[in-house]
């Protein structure tokens, strides 16, 4: 945070930070609606024409749009007014939800419209995140950024947990209900963000260039930062194999006759573990070194994933998922807070866009890998393949001198270090 930003920001507890509270609560409201709509969209497609192919296409559209817009969104967050970007995203999602609501009520819904709405949801999600992340260090003091990052992680897990549970329930009440709730949630978030005050950014030294050049500049800068590069690559590999493992476990549980209700509980426990882990993250971050907080996630997943081979009860698997989800928020808090505080303000949006793209690729390829493994080999063998992949990257993380020297951030008057300090 610049000294000017610090002068504008109170150093009271985050709960009494007006701007952070507005940003956090608005995004929570928005994310709950988005999660509910994300569950309701495939159910709506199935209700319209019963096509599993169309259902998969709609879900793929959300993910594809989010991936495709990620890097451009980061560049735009460094170029445009970040508050206006967030407001525009909420307004667009409210309008998209309203269009579905109207089409359902008028019996005029088409799959093409659902695809367009899904694309709008994906693009808006990609646009909002870099703008919010880049603005975060300007609305909270440097020393509170780690706690703010942890609270944002808890918010995401809580919204996913509550929204996905509510989506199916609301759709059972009526087809229009989840989309009405989604529209209201985005309208409420838009209203809250209207009152958000973000300190003005310093004038750019040079006028904005061509967008594609700014995107390449962001990619180049992120790649040149050794710590960011190593942590991102290791996280991508781990997320890829865990996403595959998650699908494998769901399929394995189904083959073993685990009731659908217990399988749903397994997924819910993963989200619940994420919420609890995010709440514990600020405390754990003060007790663990950065390297231990990061490496412990890899060690824990490597040790716990093979346990799935001997579990045949959905409740016990849910407990395993809960335990697996406890430590990642601490590592994410350590990594994200340092990245934000040590990245120049004019590059923070592109940082988030690039890192989000990498995470999105892992999240998209991982389930496909898991599904392919369950088709080619037995479920138990697929678990072992995923565990082996996690073990391999764990060895790399444990031996990495870059991660072993991962520095603990010490807040300074300015979070924008000199250019020389940004070079690896």
Predicted features by range, described:
Residues 1-424:
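Alpha-helical transmembrane-bundle signature of multi-pass membrane transport and export proteins
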């Amino acid at each position: 945070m610049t000294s000017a930003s610090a002068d504008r920001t109170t150093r009271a507890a985050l709960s009494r930070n007006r701007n952070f509270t507005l940003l956090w609560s608005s995004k929570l409201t928005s994310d709950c609606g988005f999660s509910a709509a994300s569950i309701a969209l495939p159910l709506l497609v199935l209700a319209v024409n019963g096509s599993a192919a169309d259902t998969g296409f709609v879900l793929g559209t959300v993910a594809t749009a989010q991936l495709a817009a990620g890097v451009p969104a980061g560049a735009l967050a460094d170029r445009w007014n970040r508050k206006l970007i967030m407001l525009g995203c909420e307004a667009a999602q409210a309008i998209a939800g309203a269009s579905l609501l109207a089409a359902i009520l008028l019996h005029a819904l088409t799959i093409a419209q659902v695809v367009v709405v899904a694309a709008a949801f994906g693009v808006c999600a990609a646009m909002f995140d870099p703008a919010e992340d880049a603005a975060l260090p300007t609305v909270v003091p440097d020393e509170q950024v780690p706690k703010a990052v942890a609270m944002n992680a808890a918010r995401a897990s809580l919204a996913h947990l509550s929204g996905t549970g509510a989506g199916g329930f609301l759709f059972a009440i009526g087809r229009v209900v989840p989309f009405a709730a989604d529209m209201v949630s985005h309208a409420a978030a838009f209203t809250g963000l209207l009152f958000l005050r973000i300190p003005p950014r310093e004038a750019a030294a040079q006028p904005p260039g061509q967008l594609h050049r700014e995107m390449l500049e962001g990619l180049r800068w992120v790649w040149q930062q050794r710590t960011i590069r190593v942590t991102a690559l290791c996280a991508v590999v781990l997320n890829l194999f865990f996403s595959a493992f998650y699908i494998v476990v769901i399929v394995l549980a189904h083959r073993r006759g685990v009731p659908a209700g217990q399988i749903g509980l397994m997924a819910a426990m993963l989200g619940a573990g994420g919420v609890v882990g995010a709440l514990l993250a600020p405390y754990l971050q003060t007790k663990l070194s950065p390297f231990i907080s990061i490496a412990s996630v890899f060690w824990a997943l490597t040790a716990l994933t093979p346990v799935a081979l001997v579990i045949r009860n959905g409740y016990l698997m849910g407990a395993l998922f809960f335990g697996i989800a406890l430590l990642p928020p601490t590592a994410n808090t350590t990594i994200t807070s340092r990245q934000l505080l040590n990245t120049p303000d004019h590059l923070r949006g592109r940082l988030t866009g690039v890192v989000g793209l990498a995470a999105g690729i892992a999240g998209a390829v991982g389930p496909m890998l898991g599904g392919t493994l369950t088709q080619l080999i037995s479920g138990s063998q697929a678990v072992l393949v995923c565990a082996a992949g996690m073990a391999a990257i764990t060895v790399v993380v444990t031996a990495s001198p870059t991660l072993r020297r991962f520095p603990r951030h010490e807040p300074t008057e300015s979070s924008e270090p000199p250019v020389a300090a940004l070079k690896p």
